[in-house]
């Protein structure tokens, strides 16, 4: 019988953070809540910290540094660097480098650090628990970030910064609220665990659950419910084909608070050069995907060459019109 493949060794620190912390939260938060209770102020602050961490990951780590979707004032960059460190998802340099590799090699089980092809558990958090070769640091795709003084300051001092943001700041807040332990449990521990899994949903569920209106070349899906949970990151199929767009939700009614935050920052002079994909390119992607599906359906049926040729000819004529007009728009975009 062939020998069973040996799994890479567990990473102790990551195992404590991603397995131990949730278990502690599951046990300690309900116990403290039952015997001591949490104040309304503690719940409000937990939500504030959660959103500041989350938007710093989506608006800072992700759309600003990983994808260069816009430019930001130094004050905003420092804000993202500090509160992003509070999310305890590694430094900007490591996070953005991994994410760029994910986009370049999406669904490649050997090169995508959190490939959905290796299963829901692996893409959600399994990839961080063991020392997989696909997760090795390689900053050759992040030379621009290595020249960024704010990014490199945070990278060098990451342990100190994230410790202060996750322990020191909740401790000071707890002293101010008159309940140190309760604040550490709610604003510190539970907020951190929730923030982790909200982000992890994008790597996992957003590659398994939802629709693929813009491209079927990878596993990324659009999912409005996940967008609500993830500060607008749930329109993942769109994002994977137009990754440099500062928006994920392109329609006015789509929930994307990260987009709204970036736009507000632009109004305040804190952001500029927002990248917005032209509408005709979006329409072209939709048409390409619809045509590919229609062609597959024809081939799956009778294989009628006449129908297939007619479909291809009509598609070519229509796309030529799109290229000439370049302003085709059947829906309203922001």
Task: Give a label for each model feature.
Residues 1-200, 246-334:
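Non-catalytic, topology-defining segments of multipass membrane proteins
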Residues 56-58, 111, 204, 223, ...:
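Generic hydrophobic/packing signal
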Residues 63, 204, 208, 240:
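Catalytic glutamate of the conserved HExxH
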Residues 145-150, 209-235, 241:
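Active-site-proximal inter-transmembrane loops
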Residues 195-213:
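C-terminal accessory segments of proteins
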Residues 237-239, 273-274:
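Conserved active-site loop/cleft motifs that coordinate metal ions or position small ligands
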């Amino acid at each position: 019988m062939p020998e069973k493949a040996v799994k890479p060794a567990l990473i102790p620190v990551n195992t404590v953070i991603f397995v131990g912390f949730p278990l502690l939260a599951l046990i300690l938060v309900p116990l403290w809540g039952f015997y001591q209770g949490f104040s309304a102020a503690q719940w409000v602050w937990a939500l504030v910290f959660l959103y500041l961490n989350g938007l710093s990951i989506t608006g800072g780590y992700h759309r600003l540094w990983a994808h260069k979707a816009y430019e930001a004032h130094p004050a905003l960059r420092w804000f993202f660097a500090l509160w992003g460190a509070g999310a305890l998802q590694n430094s900007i340099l490591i996070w953005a480098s991994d994410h760029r590799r994910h986009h370049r090699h999406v669904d490649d089980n050997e090169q995508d650090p959190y490939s959905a092809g290796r299963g829901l558990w692996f893409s959600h958090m399994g990839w961080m628990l063991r020392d997989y070769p696909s997760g090795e640091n390689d900053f050759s795709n992040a030379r621009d970030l290595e020249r960024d003084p704010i990014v490199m300051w945070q990278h060098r001092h990451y342990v100190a910064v994230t410790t202060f943001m996750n322990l020191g700041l909740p401790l000071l807040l707890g002293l101010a609220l008159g309940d140190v332990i309760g604040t550490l449990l709610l604003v510190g521990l539970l907020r951190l665990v929730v923030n982790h899994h909200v982000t992890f949903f994008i790597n996992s569920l957003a590659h398994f659950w939802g629709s693929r209106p813009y491209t079927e070349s990878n596993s990324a899906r659009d999912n409005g419910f996940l967008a609500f949970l993830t500060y607008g990151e749930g329109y993942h199929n769109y994002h994977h084909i137009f990754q440099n767009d500062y928006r994920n939700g392109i329609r006015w009614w789509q929930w994307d608070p990260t987009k709204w935050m970036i736009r507000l920052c632009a109004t305040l002079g804190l952001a500029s050069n927002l990248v917005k994909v032209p509408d005709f390119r979006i329409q072209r992607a939709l048409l390409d995907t619809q045509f590919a599906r229609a062609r597959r359906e024809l081939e799956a049926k009778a294989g009628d060459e006449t129908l297939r040729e007619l479909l291809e000819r009509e598609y070519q004529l229509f796309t030529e019109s799109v290229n000439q007009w370049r302003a085709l728009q059947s829906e309203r975009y922001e």
